[in-house]
Design a protein with these regions (language model features):
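A compositional/biophysical signature of low hydrophobicity enriched in polar/charged and small residues
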Residues: 1-127
Length: 127
């Protein structure tokens, strides 16, 4: 039963998927890799807790690789993203480095296909 799963936090929430290209409103999505110094006795949890509480943050993941976290944020402009990284994220004491990646085009998100590839309608020219 859905109500029981909601009560037990098995279903954690619902969200709306918006195709911003169709709305005509610009939205910038950034995936920020963050390298940190884990805190003694707390590991990564306290840093993750601090980062996830920023309103701009949509997702925070602990990842394996050269960086420790992947932080996904959205803003209306590149300047908003830049301000978040330089004025909020990078100044956190245990943050060592960040690498910001901007989403150029979205093909699929949360299982939803956003843009179906169009068929190439050019004619083949053969000698």
């Amino acid at each position: 039963d859905i109500k029981a799963m909601e009560d037990e936090s098995i279903i954690c929430g619902y969200h709306t998927m918006i195709d911003w290209d169709k709305v005509g409103e610009e939205m910038v999505t950034a995936m920020i890799e963050v390298k940190v110094t884990p805190q003694r006795e707390a590991g990564f949890d306290q840093i993750a807790d601090r980062v996830r509480n920023f309103d701009e943050v949509h997702s925070v993941y602990l990842i394996a690789g050269a960086y420790d976290f992947m932080v996904v944020i959205q803003g209306k402009t590149l300047r908003e993203i830049s301000h978040f990284v330089s004025e909020k994220l990078a100044i956190i004491e245990d943050v060592i480095a960040t690498s910001t990646n901007f989403v150029l085009k979205k093909y699929k998100d949360h299982g939803v296909i956003f843009q179906t590839p169009s068929q190439d309608e050019r004619l083949v020219i053969a000698p």
